[in-house]
């Protein structure tokens, strides 16, 4: 097999006739500025061709079902393996998706429980089982020889009636005896039963003695009894005393509980699926949650008194006085005060206020003429009131208002397990499938590893357990051991979702495959990075080729081969600047990546941190959503704050689910319900909140930077204001390519026409009428400063910034797009061709161009996703500009370059999942670096340098920590001849990344030296 992957003449997107030779069975990292062409080469050329060739090998019939792959614009590629891609797609937001279903572990667990699970009765908890007639006979013949018994067929169990016809029918069939309510009777003289009482009737099929010669007769009798009763037989051992539990033995062909008279259908794997009607809880249809009124949202702040409006739905609007009088009447009736905090009220009073009061209360009030009036009325209670008004609401606005007091709570029927009671009563080693799914992945792996099974079950479960354990092991390896299998996919952070997909793909254990990965380190803390790198290295050692598009320093240093694409982005990129080893990259003066890695260029440390005003802060009190452990956290206003911590420590929950959602609700009137917390102080000091998250922008070909940021509306208005447009009577709508009027109708404003080729890829050709301009001839005759609307859409943003300089509404948008580093992107460039990093910056620009008031809070979730060192530098300049105007920027981030430039750091942890949810450290980066318990602090110490840490932290412990680092550095100095003294600190930090260390020590050293000097 070829030992190289050869690419010749790649011209996809902005690639400029790129030719490359890559080693196979290696870890290859593609790096370069955002938008330089890394993804175009890795995904749109190499992966697309590998995938297309595999699909081409199938029959034309199969191909038409598979979605066609476009042939990339490349001359040829040699040495290509079947390709698997793991890209930056957002996770499924489907409420039915869980970690277990995405990773397919749950599918194997369903199979395991269906085949070796022990069913129990959901009512009484006794084991239930089924037996064939032969198995029943074999069990009976194992009993002591000579035991006498009678074979009974239960026909009626605890049912009302006289059953005259049944007795007559049995007699005609030749049966002579029956047992009615425990008494044996002759059918020739049947008893007269009371119609209104419940009766049990069993017909005596045969009377036998245990001996081998009776085997055939016993089998016939058992089969007859099973046939009569529909699958049940009772054996009554007459020699045993009446009260002996062994006297009667009941056997069933089906799953049946004789004690509760419940019979159950066969257990199949689908019975354990909450996405199937056979297994889903009938009340919540397998979702596991229901919308219920939450008392915490009714009384958000228990420190307020009733007079101050503690009961939120009753403290607003024109009904405020009415409810005030009603509460006063209840206070008189129950004898409590309304001027003390709600938390201090007696339990009886709080219960009555929330859930209602049985007896009527007397309300007294003065009407507008000053006369006192009184009436008696029922006191409904705040929770029933919200429930009733929500169900009676006729308008969406009214319904949404009351939904603001409701929260998703676990379904009361299934307790949030999503499954039917019978399914939950099936156990393996005493645990139900719901209990196994609720364990953390590491506990689940231990539980399945310690299963003790009998020989039969072992043989059945062997293969299933092997598959499950493989998948679980891999999830543990990529640092997701704290997640549980029943965790909803929608609640995962970006990094968790990405690594779950990685685990799913790599768990298959294929060899000789080309894996193309897009930034697998997103959302991963430096502490966990080495585990991911070890996984990638192990995957390579199995005999696979890995192409990783990555900006992470550690990953770049471990790579066998680096391809740096650039030198700039967009039209200024698309060339291979470097293809070779890390060492050669560091010496390459043209490569931006090389300049940063070697330390010749660095993101500087700020000389001083912006001062904080203790009176101006946002403080979240009592945060306890997800894994947060009732914490109070402060965010100083007017500074740049970074929220850090290992993956799954509760950063997104605190910032996105609680702080941002609360501010959006208070300031923007949003309807979303914030996560559980007591209150937020300081929200009166800000007047606007803006959020930029990781979700992609609209991925339709009609969406582009101009339409997404809203600047296109201003451009269309400007064209409609030109003399020519006014003469022709054109309105702004004439200049839209999405509506009839000004667009070319041949291609409906797309500029291209899709030609369907059935089982070959669809071909897109430029429209022969407008030649790709999207507009009709008349519209294109309108010019502004000599350019038509199509010319403007085709302009790079940096050119458009100068072109529209005189129009403030447009130039503001253009300047922001240019500032975030998108000057090379064309205004009308389709959103589908933007890289992940570019799409996020378009989103950022559309938020940043809004006029800042100086009292705005910007919340950004991992803004460095997909960004190169150079791009991060530009981003920090933009964010710094916002803070200098008095605004507040809060970022959730793992990137040390961003954290070291922050004014304030809130470090969450100490671990992920149940081991997190606390604030480990808060303060300036220097102070956090001095906290031994902080994982982030440990890595910050190496970036900042020991001298800065000791200066900033007034506590003794940080000084001690700093001394230790300095001592280690000194010790290393003697051993390292080629590198300067401070270099060794980086080597100490990277020691954790076991595989990384050997290749990385020297380059790492250089970088740190320069950074600390800067």
UniProtKB/Swiss-Prot annotation:
Q: Where is the composition biased (Low complexity)?
A: 976-995
A GO biological process this protein is involved in?
A: SOS response
Location(s) in or outside the cell: Cytoplasm
- Zn finger region (C4-type): 744-770
Q: Binding of ATP: at which residues?
A: 32-39, 645-652
Q: Name one GO molecular function term.
A: DNA binding
Annotated Gene3D superfamilies: ABC transporter ATPase domain-like (1.10.8.280), ABC transporter ATPase like domain (1.20.1580.10), ATP-grasp fold, A domain (3.30.1490.20), P-loop containing nucleotide triphosphate hydrolases (3.40.50.300)
Q: Which residue intervals define the domain ABC transporter in the entry?
A: 314-592, 612-941
Family membership: Belongs to the ABC transporter superfamily. UvrA family.
Q: How does it assemble?
A: Forms a heterotetramer with UvrB during the search for lesions.
Please state what the protein is called. UvrABC system protein A
